């Protein structure tokens, strides 16, 4: 089979020169293929050679590729090519068929001639080629005359697709003041046309808008800066339009464009600047340290960390600028001027300082642009306030002898009004600091004097608060703390440290140490204590004992002879005179008690006659703690036992069944109904009945104990006659005394008195009043049936009153 190349020109007569040229290319290929023997590799389908005649020579397809132009817009099917078998003699006995991609739909074949036509518009960008198979069969027997051959129909590309930017939107950035040629970003477009055929997919990039500031590489699409002076403060964002054109930019090529957003990033190329060169503030002189005077902010055209700045204060000579300091607000980048020393309007009324602002981060590349700092003058005016008087000094120490007379001068405090008016000052002592009013102060001069006698041994120091206030405005008040030390004078005699008692054996030897004596003195002389010991002048030569002054503020008592006889004298009292060093010299006499005791051979005391001798001993802290712990344990045990007993009693009482007995109360006066029972503890009253039963008596009026009988017998012993003008109170006294004695002897009476006073007729009781004065007079008001609704306890009462009512109404009926 061989093609008919001349058929390829059938549909091209009316084509444009370009399309005609494209169609001629495959025709030239057809001519070349027709003159060249077909290789065996172009004849797939040799597996069907067994269908051919055994003596037939194998033939091969001489054409296996066709071309068809895409985007054909004609009304007639587009001729693709012709397949032809060498065995075709033109008599119509051979039938040509095709199969494969698009066979029968896109591509149709004439069974007689083998002409192939494309019936649909093809798009190479969707599918570039179609693979089909051709068969030549005997029309009568449908037998393959030649092996099936595979061929390809390629869609011939035309420039019908414009370039597209597929990765937009494009956003790039570049630092301001970047040098010319600085790379910003790269953009790339794609073309769906065949890059291997012609120039349909060869793209060229160009800048349509923004060429004054940026350029683009025609081949790579890299965007670069075109100028070195991009300034973010002037323009922060640029919209650059980039165009991609195919056909290598030649005339007739298709193009596509995209917009690239280029953001100019900030660099620190602008120093801080104060909007004005002088700032003025005012503040009261009483403002405490740390008070903010005001805020000042230097402006910076940069953004981000490039605007971070610090502030410094520089004092002008003699302006007192050290009274303020400056801090930086990290959020607002404002300078906060703060008071750091106490201000004084009278000393200085205006403070002038230089405020300097500078960037934290300075880029050395832009150092040639100038210094990145600025200065402004800040003036702070101090306003006057009415200040309280000031003590000079604000605190102090005074001293006074403890034997100073009342009214003696202790010291003088001074305060003055710091204001320019210099108003007079009055003084006083805060009595909360001197509750006993030991000191007084002169209101005009501030002289402090003693108001009472002093005693260093009672209070060696006094802390008082002195008040100073303006004479015409007591609200302006200040305070000063004074410490007054009471100086000691020798006004307390020395005394023996303890009431000394010593014991000596009957067989004591001469010179034996009995007791070492020490002394205490409440005074505290500046040179220290020095005490002297000696026996009293009345007994300077004691035959039994001697006293030795050791000269270290102690003395030793020794025996004078051998042995003592406790039958003759078992106790000796040794008076000792103790003298201090003054001045003035004071003395006192103490007594050492010496007991004569019987001792064993080792000198251990056995007995001291019938007089108990207590050895002087001191308990250690551990022994004291142990003793206290024992006492606490005993107290806790006692409380625990008491609590258990009470709990046991309450438990027993709770187990007793509730007393369901009714209470019948007899009234001889116009009482208050059920409210009379509210003041009684019914369980206590009923205990009388229980106690009487236990004793075998009859609380209801039977035999009773003698105290109860006496009480009952005297129940009506009060005289009932008219009272005399001058009553005999002894009768009442005797009566009450007997009642008290009976109550004390009777164990069954309640442990408290019950005294009732009735000032109403019981209207508040749920049962209303039982008094005849408050009873109803109508028949409806005498209906007692409602008592049955009160429960079983009141049913007998309801029946009783119901029967009484029937008796009263019978005669009437």
UniProtKB/Swiss-Prot annotation:
SUPFAM superfamilies: Cadherin-like. Predominantly expressed in brain. Abundant in olfactory bulb, cerebrum, and cerebellum, less in pons, medulla, and spinal cord. Low expression in heart. No expression in lung, liver, spleen, kidney, testis, stomach, intestine, colon, and placenta. Its main location: membrane. GO terms for biological process: calcium-dependent cell-cell adhesion via plasma membrane cell adhesion molecules; homophilic cell adhesion via plasma membrane adhesion molecules. It comes from the Eukaryota. The gene is Cdh22. Residues 643-813 are cytoplasmic. PROSITE patterns: CADHERIN_1 (PS00232), CADHERIN_2 (PS50268). It is a single-pass type I membrane protein. One of its GO terms (molecular function) is calcium ion binding. Glycans are attached at residues 159, 463, 609. SMART domains: CA. Induction: Down-regulated by thyroid hormone. Cadherins are calcium-dependent cell adhesion proteins. They preferentially interact with themselves in a homophilic manner in connecting cells; cadherins may thus contribute to the sorting of heterogeneous cell types. PB-cadherins may have a role in the morphological organization of pituitary gland and brain tissues. Keywords: Calcium, Cell adhesion, Cell membrane, Glycoprotein, Membrane, Metal-binding, Repeat, Signal, Transmembrane, Transmembrane helix. The keyword Glycoprotein applies. Three calcium ions are usually bound at the interface of each cadherin domain and rigidify the connections, imparting a strong curvature to the full-length ectodomain. It is found in: Cell membrane. Residues 1-33 form the signal peptide. The keyword Membrane applies. It comes from Mus musculus. This is Cadherin-22. Residues 696-726 are annotated as: Disordered. One of its GO terms (cellular component) is plasma membrane. Residues 61-165, 166-274, 275-391, 392-495, 496-613 form the Cadherin domain. Pfam families: CADH_Y-type_LIR, Cadherin. Residues 34-621 are extracellular.
